[in-house]
Regions:
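Conserved phosphate-binding/catalytic region of the ribokinase-like
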Residues: 1-5, 188-295
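Ribokinase/PfkB-type carbohydrate-kinase core domain
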Residues: 2-7, 60-63, 68-72, 87-223, ...
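Substrate-binding N-lobe of the ribokinase-like
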Residues: 5-6, 17-82, 86-90, 97-101, ...
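Short polar catalytic/cofactor-binding loops
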Residues: 10-15
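A generic structural signal for short
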Residues: 19-21, 45-46, 122-123, 149-150, ...
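Short glycine-enriched, charge-decorated loop/helix-capping segments at active-site entrances
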Residues: 20-24, 186, 230
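Short secondary-structure capping/turn micro-motifs that flank functional sites
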Residues: 51-52, 77-78, 154, 179, ...
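N-terminal phosphate-binding loop and adjacent alpha-helix
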Residues: 52, 56, 184-186, 278
Length: 295
């Protein structure tokens, strides 16, 4: 039994592109993938269909050294897919309904297991079955909760999101999502501080794409980080998930917030030079593991 483990709850799915290409992803899956590469051995809790795509996800996890005992198999609903369309170079996403990850089953409490952090997004809250499973998981949780907001119309409701934000200590969202969820103040920093106070958070992080990220804390900190100028960007898919994975590392290892933010930006900047949301080459992670003493 691993105690003080990071639990990651939510969707594992495939993005289907117009050319027929299928790319494994889902924000929680991507985060768990990075954490595994960083020697954190996360507990990934999700559900896939009894189908070929589900088999691919399970095998990919096994090949990466990830535990699969909490990857459930649904006999009725398919492995999650997202139809990606490209219009004038901009991607659009059709997140299909009634996917296996909507039906994550509540599990029997394991009284010996202790999670240091539970990470989850907001997409997995769209269905009552998965939401109830998450409620059961967090009800007995004594550590921290990290929510990675992902507002995808029509799959979110403001009041539901607010209820979950009130249960969290750390929250990450992007600048557009902040505008949807927080009353606008004179400055972004003021808006962030109001949001932090309203939901009783310890840390609020706002990502701003190519402009980097900002954080405010209950301790009064305000931090900005920016990416380097000369990045050879392959694509930005999964940059936020890479950022979140390192934020979780910072929580787990007690890094100062400034250092955590700098390291998260550094890793996200490295990831966008690669195609796709995950990297299947451990040598990509080695410089970070060595520099951050993660062995």
């Amino acid at each position: 039994m691993i105690n003080n483990q990071i639990a990651v709850f939510g969707e594992a799915l495939f993005d289907r592109f117009p050319d027929g290409q299928q790319i494994l992803g889902g924000a929680p899956f991507n985060v768990a993938w990075h954490l595994q590469a960083f020697n954190q051995h996360p507990c990934f809790i999700s559900r896939v269909g009894n189908d070929a795509l589900g088999d691919k996800i399970r095998q990919a996890m096994l090949d990466w050294g990830m535990a699969v005992e909490n990857l459930q198999t649904d006999p009725d609903y398919p492995t999650g897919t997202v139809q990606v369309t490209i219009n004038n170079g901009d991607p659009g996403y059709d997140i299909l309904a009634e996917q296996a990850y909507d039906f994550i089953a509540a599990q029997q409490p394991d009284v010996d297991r202790r999670y240091s952090v539970i990470y989850h997004g907001t997409l997995a809250l769209r269905n009552r079955t998965s939401e109830q499973a998450l409620r059961n998981l967090t009800a007995r949780h004594q550590g921290k909760v990290f929510i990675d907001v992902n507002l995808r119309a029509p799959w979110w409701h403001k009041e539901t999101v607010y209820q979950w934000l009130d249960k969290a200590q750390w929250v990450k969202l992007n600048d557009d999502e902040l505008m949807h969820l927080a009353p606008q103040q004179n400055t972004v920093q003021d808006t962030m501080r109001l949001f932090l106070a309203r939901h009783g958070l310890e840390v609020l992080l706002v990502t701003c794409g190519s402009r980097g990220a900002m954080a405010v804390s209950q301790a009064g900190e305000y931090i900005e980080v920016v990416p380097v100028d000369d990045l050879a960007i392959a694509d930005t898919v999964g940059a936020g998930d890479a950022f979140a994975a390192v934020l979780l590392l910072g929580m787990q290892h007690g890094w100062p917030l400034q250092l955590t933010m700098e390291r998260a930006q550094s890793f996200a900047s490295a990831l966008v030079t690669k195609r796709g949301a995950t990297v299947q080459d451990l040598s990509f992670y080695r410089p970070f593991i060595d520099a951050w003493n993660l062995d």
